[in-house]
Design a protein with these regions (language model features):
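Short amphipathic alpha-helical interaction segments
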Residues: 158-173
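Minor-groove-contacting beta-hairpin "wing" of winged helix-turn-helix DNA-binding domains
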Residues: 183-187
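Short, amphipathic alpha-helical interaction segments positioned at domain boundaries
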Residues: 189-197
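C-terminal scaffold of the Radical SAM
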Residues: 1-158
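A short, conserved structural fragment
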Residues: 172-182
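Generic alpha-helical secondary structure signal
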Residues: 31, 111, 162-166, 192
């Protein structure tokens, strides 16, 4: 009833992913990747699927689509979900945990990960506790990714947020977003660039 249609991520620097044999010349260009996505999107829409957020599609009766309509759609590290997840525990090497107020990443090699687990240690290598500004930015990013719009509270602003607003002016000129006061809406034309917004 739902599927994720992700673009290939070329990460040859990550050990063990088997991508070292490819180089940039073996891969489709950004324009070719976009065409592939648009062709796939068209085929999925012909089968009755509706685009939900970025890279996700669902049938109309699926609760993922219903949560989009009801403005309850949420996104976490795994993709879009119909329920707000405030705790995700990452299991395995390099996995990322998210407690809403903090992120933690596990050690990146199998050997070190296994050793720490066998010794009863938590295999976290790094983390970040979100401050109030981080949480504000996170909320706006989620609003844009899930609802294609967000409204900034002028009483809860800070310089970086105002700078982001200025950077969006070029996207507004390209008709990718509409800005009305402190409200940003991603246009249909801009939907393909949601990650960039």
């Amino acid at each position: 009833d739902r599927l994720a249609f992700y673009s290939y991520a070329h990460v040859p620097w990550v050990k063990g992913v088997g991508q070292r044999g490819f180089d940039e010349n073996d891969l489709p260009s950004g324009e070719e990747k976009r065409r592939l996505y648009e062709d796939g999107k068209k085929l999925l829409e012909e089968l009755g699927y509706i685009e939900v957020g970025m890279d996700h599609f669902s049938l109309e009766h699926d609760d993922l689509y219903q949560s989009l309509i009801q403005k309850k759609l949420h996104r976490n590290f795994m993709g879009y979900t119909s329920s707000k997840t405030q705790l995700m525990v990452g299991l395995g090497m390099s996995a990322i945990s998210d407690s809403w107020y903090a992120f933690a990443q596990n050690i990146k090699t199998v050997e070190e990960y296994q050793k720490m687990v066998e010794e009863g240690e938590i295999p976290v290598v790094k983390g970040h506790i979100l401050n109030d500004e981080d949480l504000t930015v996170r909320r706006h990013i989620l609003n844009l990714m899930c609802q294609l719009e967000t409204t900034f509270d002028i009483h809860n602003s800070f310089p970086e947020l105002e700078n982001a607003f200025e950077m969006l002016k070029e996207m507004e000129n390209d008709e990718l977003v509409e800005i009305n006061g402190h409200h940003i809406h991603i246009t249909e034309k801009g939907r393909a660039f949601t990650r960039n917004v």
